[in-house]
Regions:
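Short, glycine/charged-enriched secondary-structure capping and boundary segments
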Residues: 129-132, 180-183, 207-208
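Bacterial N-terminal signal peptides
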Residues: 8-17
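Catalytic cysteine-centered active loop of the rhodanese-like fold, especially the PTP/DSP P-loop
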Residues: 149-202
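Pro/Ala/Gly-rich low-complexity, hydrophilic intrinsically disordered segments
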Residues: 66, 205-208
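Bacterial N-terminal signal peptides that target proteins for export
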Residues: 1-8
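Positively charged, proline/Ser/Thr-rich regional signature most characteristic
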Residues: 92-95, 103-165
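Flexible, polar/low-complexity N-terminal or interdomain linker segments that lie immediately upstream
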Residues: 22-116, 120-127
Length: 208
């Protein structure tokens, strides 16, 4: 009977020892395995469709118009800009009008005769644009650049001073087309349109 009790005590001690070893391995031998957490479900964003916006987050025409007419607090001037050509521009131009991408598309849809003059000179251009980067040069309305501008405008309009003349460069942060438009206004053209949004707005509208 005493021998049987001794065996029971030995068995209990072995059981406790194994349990302690297993517990020690769980605590110090490495991290205990936790149940895998479920990955968060992706949130689906609605595809923009209002106002002509394309899939992928491209702005619609209404949004583009707001961007193109943004007021940066820069006063409009009748004088040629002689500072940095890449910076915020006025939201208007004396003697001319700001035309938006929506307005450009309306002109095309109604097939209104007009002349587009590219004052940027980048590889990406608006369709049928006349090269005129040099029109952006600062100076005065009596300098040789103005004389040359008068000759070019006479040629592309065939002498019709009421033909819509559209000047563009890169974006509302580009003064080059502003200067070119001022030269046309000073030359006596009555329908000068400054496409302030430029080639960047044109591309954002999905145009090529």
């Amino acid at each position: 009977m005493r021998r049987f009790s001794t065996w029971l005590l030995l068995a209990a001690a072995l059981t406790l020892g194994v349990s302690g070893i297993v517990h020690a391995q769980d605590s110090f031998g490495g991290p205990r395995k936790m149940p895998a957490k479920e990955a968060p479900k992706p949130t689906l964003k609605p595809t923009p469709t209002a106002d002509g916006a394309r899939a992928g987050g491209a702005p619609g025409l209404d949004q583009l118009t707001q961007m193109e007419r943004a007021d940066y607090g820069i006063p409009a001037s009748r004088m040629l800009h002689d500072g940095e050509m890449h910076g915020p521009t006025p939201s208007s131009i004396p003697g001319g009008q700001v035309v938006t991408t929506q307005g450009m598309l309306d002109l095309q849809r109604r097939k209104v005769p007009h002349v587009i003059i590219d004052v940027l000179g980048a590889p990406e251009q608006l369709p049928n644009a006349v090269p005129g980067v040099w029109l952006a040069q600062p100076g005065s309305f009596t300098d040789p650049v103005q004389t040359r501008a008068v000759q070019l405008l006479q040629q592309v309009t065939q002498g019709q001073r009421d033909v819509p003349l559209i000047f563009y460069c890169r974006s509302p942060y580009c003064w080059m087309s502003y200067n070119a438009a001022l030269r046309a206004i000073n030359a006596g053209y009555s329908n000068v349109l400054w496409y302030r949004g430029g080639v960047e707005s044109w591309k954002m509208a999905g145009q090529r």
